């Protein structure tokens, strides 16, 4: 028991989301009278040069992904005959034309999709806008990735590196820009897929939800507040956040006294 108290004192900030009643997605599958469509999303923080490996290792990683996933995907279809697709949130700092061309072929064959992952630190509004617009345009015009909406604008899904969306770390590291919501919206971001991040300190109090967040000028962590997304309801100004699952796992707890966190990580 003494050990448990010490553990809570040291790591209690990681569990603040547990006390939050904010869960917008309350509707259960049994509430529907019609057919139910189930969507499974795998949001891969794809960094082929992870661990500062050489080009040859990064090429091997991408080649293996393309070969093995397409082989596995061909064996499965949904009721419409579509094969599973893997979504690569490609790291902007790992940009490499050869690797992206390999992923483009996988996407063209119907087995994948590419979105954006951006990591930055101590950044400015101008520099962040330049980076996100530059990688967006390069992926679309040079590699045939991403897509356009009905108005002809390039759109993309987004994951923030180190989960520090809207400068959400208390120490201000791993970001530096308080108002990322309007910058993302203006550059074509249709949704953010960053969370959950627990047990990291960046975890929002809103959990297990699909919701919109409005910007709060000059104030960080605007996505800590929001309103539920609804069918046939869209916002041109507020950012859509699509969260993965987050809950407590009592079956694999610490010494049978404290739960672990289930955050959907693979």
Regions found by a protein language model. Give the residues of each.
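Well-ordered, non-membrane alpha-helical segments in soluble/globular domains
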Residues: 56-74, 99-100, 128-142, 173-183, ...
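Flexible loop/turn segments at secondary-structure boundaries
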Residues: 48-50, 94-98, 123, 199-202, ...
């Amino acid at each position: 028991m003494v050990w448990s108290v010490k553990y809570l004192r040291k790591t209690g900030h990681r569990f603040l989301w547990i006390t939050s009643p904010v869960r917008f997605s309350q509707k259960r599958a049994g509430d529907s009278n019609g057919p139910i469509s189930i969507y499974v999303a795998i949001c891969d923080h794809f960094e082929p040069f992870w661990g500062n490996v050489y080009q040859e290792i990064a090429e091997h990683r991408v080649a293996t992904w393309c070969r093995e996933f397409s082989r596995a995907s061909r064996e499965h279809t949904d009721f419409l005959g579509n094969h599973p697709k893997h979504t690569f949130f490609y790291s902007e700092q790992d940009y490499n034309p050869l690797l992206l061309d390999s992923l483009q072929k996988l996407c063209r064959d119907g087995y994948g999709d590419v979105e954006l992952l951006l990591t930055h630190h101590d950044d400015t509004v101008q520099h962040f806008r330049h980076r996100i617009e530059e990688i967006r345009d390069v992926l679309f015009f040079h590699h045939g990735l991403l897509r356009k909406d009905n108005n002809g604008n390039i759109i993309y899904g987004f994951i923030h590196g180190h989960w520090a969306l809207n400068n959400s770390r208390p120490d201000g590291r791993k970001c530096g820009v308080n108002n990322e919501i309007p910058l993302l919206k203006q550059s074509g971001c249709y949704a953010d897929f960053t969370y959950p991040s627990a047990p990291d300190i960046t975890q929002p109090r809103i959990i297990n939800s699909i919701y919109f967040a409005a910007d709060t000028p000059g104030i960080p962590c605007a996505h800590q507040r929001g309103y539920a997304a609804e069918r046939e309801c869209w916002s041109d100004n507020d950012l859509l956040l699509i969260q993965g699952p987050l809950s407590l796992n009592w079956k694999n707890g610490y010494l049978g006294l404290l739960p672990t966190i289930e955050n959907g990580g693979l």
